[in-house]
Structures are given as C-alpha cells and as structure tokens.
C-alpha cells in the first residue's frame, strides 16, 4: 500500500522489554537457558510489541528493537574493526559498553535482515519501519584508535550502513529510519556529518527518515537543504515545541514528537490534538507524521502503551477535522531521488 491516513502515527524504535524477556536474558547470561530458548523469547517479545502497537492503533510500527541492548553496541558487535574493552560510566550508576575502532571498519554480513523478516511475518501491517544507527552517531560514540579522523571513520561507516540498507530494501523494507541522536553535538562537524548520512542512504529508493532527538537543533538548521532524507523526525514535546521555528523552511515530511518519553505523566488525547493543531500553523498536513519524542524503552510498559494509545486518539481527533477539509491520505513513496 502506497498511502497512509493523513497524519500517520508511528513510533521511534525502541519499546519497553517485557519483564519475562529481561529474565530470559538474565538466565541466558547465567548459562541456564539455551540460545534457542532465548531466540524464542525474543520472537515472542516482538509479537507482544506488535500486538501493543496494533491495539494502540499505530499506523507504522517497529519491532521495538527487542533484540538490541544498545543502539551503537549492537552494530559494533557485528562489524569488523571494533573491539570492546569494558564498560564505561555514562552518568551516575549507568554504564555503556563503548566500542573501540581498532582496524578498518568493514561489512561482514546482514545485521538486521533476519529480525526485519521475522517482524514482517508477524506484523499486522506491511508498513513496518526498521531502524538503523547512523554513521556519525556510531563514530561519535566510539573510541577511534585507528582512523586519522572521526570524519574518515564516519564515511567508512556510511559505506557499511549503505550495504545493510540495500539488503533491507531487497528484503522488502518500505521505511528505513536512520537514528542520528549525536549529529548536532559539535557545531563544526554538522556539515560533513550530513554528508556522511547522505552517503549512507545513497541509492536507497524507499522512504528514508532521519531521527534526531535531544540536542542543539540550531546547529542543524543551516544545512537542512543538503540533507537527502524524505523525513526528519524530531523531539519537540520535551522542548515545549520551541525548536519548531528552526524548521519553518523544511519542505519535506517532518515527524513531530508529541509525547515526552522522559516523563511518566500520560498525555491526554485532547492535549495531543491541541499540540497538533498548533503544529499545523507551521507545517502542511501532508508533511506531518506523529510520534513520541524518542524511543520508549525506559518507560514502564503500561505507561508507554497508554501514551501511544492517547497519541493515536489525539491524532484521530485532528485527522477527522482535516478530512472535512479534503485531506485524506499521505503518500508512502520516497520524496527524494537518491
């Protein structure tokens, strides 16, 4: 299907793991259950997540990234050139397995195709989104012990990510999201970081989204016209929508974050509807996709589900008003020739 309802609803990627999956992972690490049993638990979790998304009414779901611990670690474990020395403290008592690049980064084999095909086989819709961490974020969140510069590393990463994306398209992916939460970390690197993203999506003839969450959006604004994605996806609710004014000249699709993922307070449908009506003062209806600010994995599952449910309910309020004005659907086709 090449069309979605006006104001399509989606998720960013991650979703809370069910408690029983977390227990299965613990038991597997302790050697108490087999690899086969763990894979069955992952499969069951994906079915559960897609069921939650279906009941909530999400138009474009994901598999919740059930098989991924972290967004950089997952890919570093599956590419040549990376090594892990041990956990690094990020903040407080939170630790992260930060990878080190010790040799040339190279593509070995598909990393996401199997998980995409399984999710596709159990999904309630063919409009399933698959997410992949972008080249700049992997480079920024890794130790570089091999390349002359972070830029050189990012462009090699772009090549391997491009190889993976092409495999996903061959497998039937219709929507691919590049996650670049770090892209606006350093003002003087944004221009070439966007070039690296463009390199990673070259030749990808399906809808491509770039998700950018919390940070300095003003660093991105001067280079938006150089970005070759069909949609840019932003965290806005947590910022009280202040960054919106920076994207007034953006003329493609925009994913608007209307759910705060760092707050357990559940937004009401009316609140979501009012926020969307305000955003329609900035963007045409056919440009807007509706989503949470970021991934939902850190929230309790019941709260994450209720937030999604109310997001969809609020969107439907505005959708009905738009239908009365002649707006019915949004195209799923890519907007940019890459």
UniProtKB/Swiss-Prot annotation:
Keyword Transferase: yes
Domain of life: Archaea
NCBIfam families: PRK04326.1 (NF003317)
Pfam families associated with the record: Meth_synt_2
UniProt cofactor(s): Zn(2+)
Stated family: Belongs to the archaeal MetE family.
Protein name (record): Methionine synthase
Entries under Gene3D superfamilies matching the protein: 3.20.20.210
E.C. designation(s): 2.1.1.-
Job of this protein: Catalyzes the transfer of a methyl group to L-homocysteine resulting in methionine formation. The physiological methyl donor is unknown.
Cofactor binding, per record: Binds 1 zinc ion per subunit.
InterPro entries on file: Met_Synth_C/arc (IPR002629), MetE_arc (IPR022921), UROD/MetE-like_sf (IPR038071)
Annotated residues for binding of Zn(2+): 211, 213, 294
Pathway given in the UniProt record: Amino-acid biosynthesis; L-methionine biosynthesis via de novo pathway
MF terms (GO), sorted A to Z: 5-methyltetrahydropteroyltriglutamate-homocysteine S-methyltransferase activity; zinc ion binding
Keywords carried by this UniProt record: Amino-acid biosynthesis, Metal-binding, Methionine biosynthesis, Methyltransferase, Transferase, Zinc
Listed CDD domains: CIMS_C_terminal_like
Species the sequence originates in: Sulfurisphaera tokodaii (strain DSM 16993 / JCM 10545 / NBRC 100140 / 7) (Sulfolobus tokodaii)
Any one GO biological process: methionine biosynthetic process
């Amino acid at each position: 299907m090449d069309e979605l309802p006006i104001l399509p609803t989606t998720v960013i990627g991650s979703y809370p793991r069910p408690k029983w999956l977390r227990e299965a992972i613990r038991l597997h690490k302790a050697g108490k259950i087999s690899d086969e049993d763990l894979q069955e638990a992952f499969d069951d979790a994906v079915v559960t997540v897609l069921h939650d998304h279906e009941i909530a009414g999400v138009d474009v779901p994901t598999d919740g990234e059930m098989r991924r611990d972290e967004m950089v670690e997952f890919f570093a474990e599956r590419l040549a050139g990376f090594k892990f020395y041990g956990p690094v403290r990020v903040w407080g008592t939170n630790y992260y397995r930060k990878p080190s690049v010790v040799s040339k980064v190279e593509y070995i084999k598909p990393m996401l195709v199997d998980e995409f095909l399984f999710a596709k086989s159990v999904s309630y819709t063919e409009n399933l989104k698959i997410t992949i961490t972008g080249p700049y974020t992997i480079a920024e969140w890794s130790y570089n012990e091999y390349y002359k510069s972070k830029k050189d590393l990012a462009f090699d990463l772009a090549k391997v990510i491009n190889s993976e994306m092409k495999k996903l398209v061959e497998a039937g992916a219709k929507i691919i999201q590049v996650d670049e939460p770090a892209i606006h970390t350093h003002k003087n690197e944004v221009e070439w970081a966007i070039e690296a993203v463009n390199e990673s999506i070259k030749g990808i003839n399906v809808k491509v989204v770039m998700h950018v969450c919390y940070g300095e959006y003003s660093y991105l604004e001067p280079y938006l016209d150089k970005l070759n994605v069909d949609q840019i996806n932003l965290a806005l609710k947590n910022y009280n929508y202040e960054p919106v004014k920076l994207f007034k000249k953006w003329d493609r699709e925009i994913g608007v974050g209307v759910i705060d993922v760092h707050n357990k307070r559940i937004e009401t449908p009316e609140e979501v509807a009012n926020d969307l009506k305000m955003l329609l003062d900035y963007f045409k209806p056919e440009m807007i996709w509706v989503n949470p600010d970021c991934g939902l994995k850190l929230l309790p599952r019941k709260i994450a589900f209720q937030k999604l449910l109310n997001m969809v309910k609020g969107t439907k309020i505005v959708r009905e008003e738009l239908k009365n004005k002649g707006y019915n659907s949004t195209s799923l086709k890519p907007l940019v020739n890459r």
